[in-house]
Amino acid sequence: MLTAEAMAEFGIGVQENIGVYSQNMRECLYTDFGAYANRAVPIPLYATSSPAQIEYIVKDADIHTLFVGEQLQYNNAFKVQQITPGLTRLIIFDSAVKMNPEDKTSIYFDYFLRLGNNAQAEAPVKVRMKEASEDDLATIMYTSGTTAEPKGGLLHHSNFMQSMRIHEARLPEVTDKDTSMCFLPLTHIFEKAWVAFCIYRGVKIAINKDPKMIQQTLPEIHPTLMCNVPRFWEKVYVGVQEKINNSPGLIKSIFNDAIKTGRLYNLEYKNKSITPPLSLELKFNFDNKTVFAMLKRVLGLERGKLFPVAGAPLSDSVNEFLQSVNIPIRYGYGLSETTATVCFFPAIG
C-alpha cells in the first residue's frame, strides 16, 4: 500500500498512465501493484529500449511519470525528458544511479516511498480502491517495435481476473508452497500474467535480475515453477547433449539409455494414459531417481512442478527430450491481446 499512497501523494491520478522502464526488479512489482491499488495504469517498457523507442511510447501513451531501473535506463530516460515536455518526472529504482548534474526533478524510489508515509496519503487510496472496477484499464502492453513502431494492446482488470479464474481451475496444483522464478522480462505478457497468477495463488516470487546469470540463479533458488520461452529450453537441450556427447563411453551409454527409457515411458504410455509394462515402469522409476534426478539437480530444477513454455514454436526434438527426462513443461499458446494464455496441453494426454 505504501507505493500506492506515495503515488496518490505524488499527484498520480486515477487511470493515469505511468511508465516502468527497467529490467526485472522487485520495485517493478511494487510499482505495478501500487498502481493497481491507486487505479493508475503501469506501462512496462523493455529495459533494452533505445531513447527513440522510449520517446515514442512516452508520447503515444501520454506518460508524465517514468520509473527507471539502473544507470542505462536513467541515462536514456533523461535524454528523452530533455526533448519531451510532457515527461516531467523520473523516479529511479536503483539508489546507486548517478544523476545528471543538470537534473533537478528526478528522485530515488526510496525517497518517493516516504511521500506515502503519512496519514493523509492513505485516505485517497482507500477511496480509489473502493471505486475500482474490473472495467478499469490495467496496463498497456507495447510490442518490442523491432519491425515497426510499437503497438500498444489495452488490457483491463477484467482480462486479468478472467485469466486468474481459468488458470486457477486448470492449475489447482499451484499453491502458496511454491516458488516461481521470474526470468522473462516483465514487459512480456507471458511473465507479467504468470506473476500475477502466482501472486493471486500466494506463490513466492524469486526475481532473476540479469538474464545472463540464470544458470547460477536456478541452483540457488530451486524453483518449483517458471514460465519460459522455447529458446531457453533449446539452450538447455544443446548444453545437455554436448555434456553427454563429451562424456566417457559408459556414462554416455547410461544417459542415452535412460533418455530412451524415459521417452518410451512418458510419450508412448503415460501421455496416452496406457499402463506400461512392469519392467518398463521399474526401469523408468530407477532412471528417474538416479540419472534424471542428477541432471535436474545440476540444472537447479529438481523441485520442478510446472514449467509453462510458450511465445514461439517448441521443436519436437526439444519437447520430446524434456518430457523424456521428466522435466514438467506445459506447452501452450497465447497473445498479448489475450492476457497471454489461449490454450495449453494437459499434463497427461
Describe these PLM feature segments.
Residues 32-38, 60, 196-200, 237, ...:
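Short hydrophobic alpha-helices that are characteristic scaffold elements of the AMP-binding
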Residues 72-134, 240-294:
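ANL superfamily adenylate-forming
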Residues 3-52:
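Conserved AMP-binding/adenylate-forming
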Residues 157, 314, 323-327, 335-349:
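Active-site loops of AMP-binding adenylate-forming
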